[in-house]
Amino acid sequence: MQLVEKLNALCASRKLEKKIVDKIADNGVLITFCVFTLMAILIRFSVKDFESGDYIGSLALWYDHFKTHRGFAALRSPIGDYNVPYQFFIALMTYIKVKPLYLFKILSCIFDFLLAIYSGKFVYYISSERTGESRSLKDAISNLTFVLPYGVVLLLPTVVFNSALWGQCDAIYAFFIVLSLFLICRKSYFFSFVFLGCAFAFKLQTVFILPFFFYLYFREKNFSIFFLLFLPLVDILLSIPSLCMGLRFSKLVDVYINQSDAYHYVYMNYPSFWAMIGDNYDYLKPVAIIITLMILFVGLLYIVRKKVDLKSADNFLSVAVWSVWTCVLFLPSMHERYAYLAEILIVILFFMKLWSEDRKNLGRICVVACVLQLMTCIQYGRYLFQNSYMNFGMTLILHTSVYLFFSYKLFVNGFQKNDETIDEF
C-alpha cells in the first residue's frame, strides 16, 4: 500500500514538474527579459561604491556647491561645464537624503534602461513592419526581436562602465537621439526634433548625429530644415527653471562655447585619426574640423547623386552609424566616451539585420560592433583602472582600419538598392 502511495506521489510530482517546465518553455522569452533586467540591476548594484576621477574631481564638487548654496537657488550661478538641464538634476539631488554618488549613478542607470527599451523597441518596430505583428510594448516583451537588443544594450560593457562605474550621463543624450530616430521612422517629425532638442540640451555631442539629419533632409525632403530650430528652443524651455532663478541668458550659450574649447588636445585617450599625426592643437584643430566637414560633405554628395534610399532600414542606420563615427574619428579633442552613440546604433543595426530577410553584411556589422566595443573598453580601462596593457598604437591602427573597412563596404557595395526587397519604414 505504501509503495502504491509513493508511486502516486512520484507521478504527481512529475506532473507538477512537467507543468513547471512547460510553463517556463511557454514563457521563455519573458523569463529571458526578466533575467536580463535582473542581471543588469545586480551588476550595477555591485559597483555602486566605485568613485571615478570625474566624480571626485567634478560631480561631487558640483553637488557640494548646490548643497551649500541652497539647492535650486544655486541655479542662478551654475558650476562646471555641464549643461543647465543636467545641473537642475544636481540641484534636485540635494533635497534627497541619499548618498550623492548613488544619486548620480541612479539617474544615469534610469536612462540606461530607457535607452535599452527604445533600442529594443526600434528593432521590434522594424521587424513588425515586415511581419505585421503587434507593436505594443506588452507584446514586445514576449518577443525576441525586442528582448535580445534590449538585453545586449543594457549589458554592453561601455554602457555599464559609463553609468555604473564612471557616473557619467551619456545614456541621457543617447536615449533622446535613439528616440528621435525612432520617431523619424514613424514619420513623427515634430516630436522627433523635439527629442533631438532634448538631447542637445543635455550634451553638445548631439552634433555628431546632425550630419545624418542633413543627409535625410537633402535626400528624402520629408521635413523642413527649420525643424533644426528646435535644438536651441528646447534647450531654452528646459532651462526655464534656471532662468527663473536668475540665470543670465548668455550662460546658455557660454556652456556650449566652454565645452567646445575645454580641452586643448587634438586627441584625448581615444584612438582618433589625429593620434597618428601629432598633438599640435593650435595648428591641427582647424585642419581636423575642415577635413571632417569635407568627408561628411563627400558622403552627402554620394548619397544625393546615387539616390541612396534612406527609407531602407539598413541604409538609414548604416549612414547614421557612419556619420557619428566619422565625427568621433576625425574631429579634434575626442575622448573615449564620445563613441557611445555609434556603439548603440550599430547594435541596433546588427539586430535589425539579424531579423531581416536579407542578412547580407551581418558578419561585417558584428565585427565592427565588437571592435568598437573593444576599442572603447580598452580606453575606459586606461582611465578608470589605469590599465595600460594594450598598446595605444595598436588600438589606433585597428580602429582606423575597421572604420575604413566599414566605409569602403558601405559606399562601394553596402547600400541597399531601391529595387531590392528591403524592410522599409
PLM feature segments, named:
Residues 1-44, 110, 124-148, 312, ...:
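Start-transfer (signal-anchor) and selected internal transmembrane alpha helices
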Residues 24-57, 109-112, 155-157, 161, ...:
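Transmembrane signal-anchor helices characteristic of membrane glycosylation enzymes that use polyprenol
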Residues 2-10, 47, 252-271, 320, ...:
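Transmembrane helical bundles and short interhelical boundary loops of multi-pass, membrane-embedded
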Residues 48-64, 77-89, 263-273:
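Extracytoplasmic catalytic/substrate-binding loops of multi-pass membrane glycan-assembly enzymes
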Residues 118, 172-189, 345-349:
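Specific aromatic-rich, kink-prone transmembrane helix
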Residues 28, 40, 116, 125, ...:
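Aromatic/glycine/proline-enriched transmembrane-helix motif characteristic
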Residues 161, 177-183, 190-215, 323-330:
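Membrane-interface alpha helices of multi-pass inner-membrane proteins
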Residues 208-233, 341:
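Perimembrane helix-loop-helix junctions
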